[in-house]
């Protein structure tokens, strides 16, 4: 839905740009203003009161969405031997080591998450410049560097997503599909917000949640009241 299209303009007219909506109001409105041509992804964007240039103000972590993302994540695993077999059995899309690294060095990045066993990280470091900027670099803090690759694959396939604040202090996360019930989208939103609040750096000063916006991929942005941090299903 192009921002210049009639459909987008009509959708945008339904949104009060001066209002701060409750989470449930926002997800209902996101569904209502979504394109009817396809099942759009619903996202939440947040601006945080942190300075990510400071190491002690980097906000990152994982969240398990209770209702999943609505899409099947493509997961790759860097592992060999029994660990590689376990990853494949758990449903990893691609499993490898040097061969997988070479493939990525050749320009292939058609996946949503990367997992590695600890012994593979020295090799994976060779493609850090490719994976890092895309938020795909395996990291112990997000559970993607682990000897239990099977569990990591199962978690991600089941709706576990990673988050990391960008250099502009923004976060972008998927909370589902427009076909989800508004209540399920709101419960996913609540799970996300809980984790973001839990990840607040102790050194962050002032207002932490500066702005929260819910939207579908191509729909208008809907501002959510950042002061609503509990009882998410109340209208």
Curated annotation (Swiss-Prot):
Task: Cite a single GO BP annotation.
Answer: translation
Extract the Pfam families matched here: Ribosomal_L1
CC terms in the record's Gene Ontology section: large ribosomal subunit
Keyword hit for Ribonucleoprotein: yes
User: Keywords for this entry?
Assistant: Repressor, Ribonucleoprotein, Ribosomal protein, RNA-binding, rRNA-binding, Translation regulation, tRNA-binding
GO molecular function, one example? Answer: tRNA binding
InterPro entries cross-referenced by the UniProt entry: Ribosom_uL1_bac-type, Ribosomal_uL1, Ribosomal_uL1-like, Ribosomal_uL1/biogenesis, Ribosomal_uL1_3-a/b-sand, Ribosomal_uL1_CS
Q: Provide the family line.
A: Belongs to the universal ribosomal protein uL1 family.
- Function noted in UniProt: Binds directly to 23S rRNA. The L1 stalk is quite mobile in the ribosome, and is involved in E site tRNA release. Protein L1 is also a translational repressor protein, it controls the translation of the L11 operon by binding to its mRNA.
Q: How does it assemble?
A: Part of the 50S ribosomal subunit.
Q: PANTHER family, from UniProt?
A: 54S RIBOSOMAL PROTEIN L1, MITOCHONDRIAL, LARGE RIBOSOMAL SUBUNIT PROTEIN UL1M
* Name under which the protein is recorded: Large ribosomal subunit protein uL1
> Whose protein is this, by species?
Mycobacteroides abscessus (strain ATCC 19977 / DSM 44196 / CCUG 20993 / CIP 104536 / JCM 13569 / NCTC 13031 / TMC 1543 / L948)
Q: Which gene encodes it?
A: rplA
């Amino acid at each position: 839905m192009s921002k210049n299209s009639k459909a987008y303009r009509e959708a945008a007219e339904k949104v009060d740009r001066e209002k701060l909506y409750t989470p449930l109001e926002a997800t209902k409105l996101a569904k209502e203003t979504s394109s009817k041509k396809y099942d759009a992804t619903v996202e939440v964007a947040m601006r945080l009161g942190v300075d990510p240039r400071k190491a002690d103000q980097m906000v990152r972590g994982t969240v398990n969405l209770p209702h999943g993302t609505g899409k099947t994540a493509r997961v790759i695993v860097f592992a060999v031997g029994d660990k590689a077999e376990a990853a494949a059995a758990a449903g990893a899309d691609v499993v490898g080591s040097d061969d997988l690294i070479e493939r990525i060095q050749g320009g292939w990045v058609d996946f949503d998450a990367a997992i590695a066993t600890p012994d593979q990280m020295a090799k994976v470091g060779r493609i850090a410049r490719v994976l890092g900027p895309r938020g795909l670099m395996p990291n112990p803090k997000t559970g993607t560097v682990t000897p239990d690759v099977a569990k990591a694959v199962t978690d991600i396939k089941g709706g576990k997503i990673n988050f990391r604040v960008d250099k502009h202090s923004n976060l972008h996360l998927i909370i589902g599909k427009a076909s989800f019930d508004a209540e399920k989208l709101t419960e996913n939103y609540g799970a996300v917000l809980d984790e973001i609040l839990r990840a607040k750096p102790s050194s962050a000063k002032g207002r932490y949640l500066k702005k929260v916006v819910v939207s579908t991929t191509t729909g208008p942005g809907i501002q959510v009241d950042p002061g609503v941090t509990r009882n998410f299903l109340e209208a």
